[in-house]
Amino acid sequence: MPKLPRIDFYFDVISPYSYIAFEVFQKLETQWKGVTIRYIPFFLGAVMKESGNRPPAMLPARSIMMMTDLKRTAKFWDIPLTPPPLFMEWIKKYRTTGAMKVLLVLQEQDKELMLRAAREMWVRLWSRSEKIFEDQDFVEVLKAVGVKNPEQIVEKSKDEKYIKILMENTNKGVDLMAYGAPWINVHTEDGSEHSFFGSDRFHLIADLLQQPQPLPDRLFGQKSKL
């Protein structure tokens, strides 16, 4: 088990807030000394069902504000994010279990490769408006990150083992009272645990772990004028 303090980052690639939080955590891994970050794929659809939550995109007023909020947040962190025009149609038709199982296969082999593939899925969906739901989509993602046997990885992901791991991860998230993604569980050095939702709690996590407050690259290192 990774040493403490530790951040367990539960994510699903359908979630744009997971994308934003992922990119921020990738920067913080080099800035927050002594903090371990574990990236844990789970299935957001099951989390929403178990918690009784509904996707923001399915609530008209909330979906409008969500898109505005996403653009603001992505701009602040310098993350290229454009909601795909067919997003509503896609989330009604497809699930992300296939994508998440592919990531689990990669995670078994090479954590860094899994992280590159997860980023490619987010960029594909949230920057290029391309699907990430079917076998051919997965093959294209894997080729983009340099996997030499993409078809074999996709086929391996269909083994029952990986849906079991995915649901175990999902159930752990539900046990932590997760109701959306990303779900962030912080383990402090004294052994206590603290849960956070979303991509706008980094200042609280930094304070909890007594780490530097996170800033986008253009502001990192600047001193306050106050």
Swiss-Prot record:
GO MF terms, alphabetically ordered: glutathione peroxidase activity; glutathione transferase activity
GO terms classed as biological process: glutathione metabolic process; innate immune response
Gene3D superfamilies: Glutaredoxin (3.40.30.10)
Matching InterPro entries: DSBA-like_thioredoxin_dom, GST_Kappa/NadH, GSTK, HCCAis_GSTk, Thioredoxin-like_sf
Superkingdom in the source lineage: Eukaryota
Residues the record lists as binding glutathione: 15-17, 53, 199-200
Catalysed reactions, as listed in the record: RX + glutathione = an S-substituted glutathione + a halide anion + H(+)
EC number: 2.5.1.18
EC supergroup of this enzyme: transferase
Entry's Gene Ontology cellular component terms: mitochondrion; peroxisome
Pfam families tied to this protein: DSBA
UniProt keyword annotation of 4Fe-4S present: no
Keywords per UniProt: Transferase
Family statement: Belongs to the GST superfamily. Kappa family.
PANTHER family listed in its UniProt record: GLUTATHIONE S-TRANSFERASE KAPPA, GLUTATHIONE S-TRANSFERASE KAPPA 1
Protein name: Glutathione S-transferase kappa 1
Gene coding for it: gstk-1
